[in-house]
Amino acid sequence: EAKGAFGDAAVFLERYAPRARHVEVQVLGDSHGTVLHLGDRDCSLQRNHQKLIEEAPAADLPEALRDDMLSAAVRLAQSIGYRSAGTVEYLYDPASGEYYFLEMNTRLQVEHPVTEAITGIDLVEWQLRIARGETLALTQSDVQFDGHAIEVRIAAENPAENFRPETGRITLWAPPAGVRLDSGVAAGSVVGHHYDSMLAKLIVHAPDRAGAIRQAVAAIDAFAVGGVGLNLSYQRALLTHADFQAFRHHTSGLPDMFPEGWAQPTPDARDTGLAVMALHLHLAPAGASPWESLGSWRLTAPAGRPGAASYWATSADEPIRMSDVPGALAAVLPDGQNIEAEAPALTGDRLSGRIDGVPFSRVAHIERAGHHWRVHL
């Protein structure tokens, strides 16, 4: 059959490893015979063979096996006189302790920033310098590894609806501060259906894996986007899942992690209360002073925000009741929980105030959606 279809009777057999981990090695080779490895990465969290979250180094690998993988990658690149940045990919079967060659990608991978984070080496720069004929100004002993890095792929899709693509105009793009974000979009960008759904890569770096996970979760929580839905909540669920944190995940492990599928989580009480406060301030600003009015006024005119108002969340049976109290706003949720913010203020897309005496300031982007309002925190 192979002879008839391809003119070659050779058949290439691959080992079937249903619960494998995807481990890859970054290499650099110049035109003067030098080849180095820059450590390994783990890319085992995948959906339909598409990577979701990557990290470096690959955690929980036996050190002897890691050394063998790294050495094999260097020998492979040396044997073909490889020149450039490249990635040697393996499948590792924890059950047998064996690993198998998968492929070599002769380019920079999407996930190369995690290697840059732990080595401090600019891979794009060295790819260009090697192409110009320069000699690698590094030895293998110069390559040192510092801490742990995680990359989260941010895509315009709805995981709760079978990863349906999201399209539209981005009305708010407020990424978190203090982390690396590789992206080519901004507020006003139009997300269409003609291209890949990935809009950005979020990269964090910490002294250890647990710290990197915490940083990634905090960055996702601080990321505010409007106009187009993203997979942020899904990626957060992966990062906080016990299987990922204990390194029990594998390339086909998503059904094990979410056996009944994944549903968009319900906002917690604090976020719900703050969202309604932001909308309340947006719809009924406090400044009703006659001295700030350009027209005539009378004593019976409305004097600022109403003392109380009710708001219904989508599909809710009971309203969220908002009331002005001296120097504060209080939101009473349908379940009776009370969220009170002192000195609340909405300035542009930022809501600020104090809760239990602790100051807060966060993005609160409000947009009209037909007969509804959307608040993006």
Residue map of PLM features:
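Protein kinase-like catalytic core scaffold
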Residues: 23, 34-37, 98-103, 180, ...
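Catalytic cores of soluble metabolic enzymes centered on carboxylation/carboxyl-transfer
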Residues: 113-340, 344
